[in-house]
Amino acid sequence: MKIITCFKLVPEEQDIVVTPEYTLNFDNADAKISQFDLNAIEAASQLATDDDEIAALTVGGSLLQNSKVRKDVLSRGPHSLYLVQDAQLEHALPLDTAKALAAAIEKIGFDLLIFGEGSGDLYAQQVGLLVGEILQLPVINAVSAIQRQGNTLVIERTLEDDVEVIELSVPAVLCVTSDINVPRIPSMKAILGAGKKPVNQWQASDIDWSQSAPLAELVGIRVPPQTERKHIIIDNDSPEAVAELAEHLKKALN
């Protein structure tokens, strides 16, 4: 079985700076694998047998130049890495991202696609579903467990009040939740071995992809201004204090 696990590179949260204008400055933010996609990579690694092949795939812009992240991905189980780097994909929204991934996936070849439930930045929860629609494949989201029985997959979906159990044949698309596993911490041997694994880098033209007319535009990302604390402390439980607390709450809600 050939498994492709797709991931996104996102800025390191602790390096993002909020400006006085309540916008976000990413200039000094290093790249990392989206936390939800670490679960997808781990799910692929746990599912695969010795006869299977795991490929990791991502599309994007300048963040893909980070060699440390490339080694991080390959140290977590995938046998090879595919990158589609193009300026048009720098800030691509879910539809364009999905179209680029689908084009690359068709070129690579696959049996099973595994995605995280969303990305660590936009968390749109759309890309895996859109890829399945573009490729006309069955898609199951909210996957909390995967078992393999020959060429059949037994999938669990943990819902609010139920756990669904679904039998599925490949090819298919799975979108896994963050509860499905605990991503591994790569060993030193795995990190050193990652440097010997193949990395395939393409441009948009290599997969016959071009940016479509946008149906939506990301105008900007702003941080809501923080509300100043009132520093009112009521330090007893007398009826008068309770009444005072109620009065403050009424003022705050009105």
What function would you assign to each model-found segment?
Residues 1-254:
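N-terminal glycine-rich FAD/FM-binding segment characteristic of electron-transfer flavoproteins
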